[in-house]
């Protein structure tokens, strides 16, 4: 991804420290990460200030507003799945898969309003991604 000068990108160092610290203890199994975000190119394409935002009283806060109510604002950002993919592939090789929540759930979905909400490609189904990491 070719970022622009002055563009803000979120880096998930805490995940990298946790994953690499825990990896020697993980002998076998599947780890699944489900969160909102995307791969770097799609995530930051129209977000020169990054995805960091806050929520206070059901209002979205960005920019300097994030810092006006310390302790009263929930801060969040989208997961940059490119970082997680690269880390996982470097540690585990080809046993890593990334897909949308929609693609992950469709084989199990029933014709209900709840499943329609979870698999809507323009809603939760497209905004949430699933990273499956296997150690065989």
Predicted stretch roles:
Residues 1-136:
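Long, Lys/Arg- and hydrophobic-enriched amphipathic alpha-helices
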């Amino acid at each position: 991804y070719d970022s622009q000068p002055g563009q803000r990108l979120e880096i998930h160092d805490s995940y990298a420290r946790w994953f690499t610290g825990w990896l020697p203890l993980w002998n076998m199994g599947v780890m699944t990460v489900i969160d909102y975000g995307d791969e770097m190119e799609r995530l930051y394409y129209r977000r020169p200030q990054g995805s960091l935002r806050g929520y206070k009283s059901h209002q979205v806060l960005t920019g300097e507003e994030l810092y006006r109510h310390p302790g009263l604002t929930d801060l969040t950002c989208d997961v940059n799945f490119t970082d997680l993919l690269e880390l996982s592939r470097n540690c585990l090789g080809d046993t890593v898969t990334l897909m949308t929540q929609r693609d992950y759930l469709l084989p199990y979905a029933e014709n209900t309003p709840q499943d329609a909400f979870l698999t809507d490609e323009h809603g939760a189904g497209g905004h949430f991604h699933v990273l499956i990491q296997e150690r065989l």
